[in-house]
Amino acid sequence: GYPHYNIKKLDDNKWSIELALAGFSKDDIEIEVKDNIMNINGELKTEDNEYVYKGISSRKFSKSFTLAEFTECESATMENGILSIILEKNIPEDKKPQKVKIK
């Protein structure tokens, strides 16, 4: 479905989601994270032009990603039609597995 995207692993606790959004600006896009769901919505502001031919899509979109527990959106940047979102998993110390020494 639209938009096309890649998910890259940057390290054990960090990922990047890149969405191809040619024609969109950062002002056309909204990112919201709630209850481990990241929703990305976009809508191009339409102009009242009279087209002889219209081959470039100006649709709106909505894309959702389920995030692992303790995953946070670290940053989002828009460059050359690519929206890059950096996600990082930050497990609190009291939730990490505890190693038990055997005596």
Task: Give, region by region, the residue ranges found by the protein language model.
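Alpha-crystallin/small heat shock protein
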Residues: 1-103
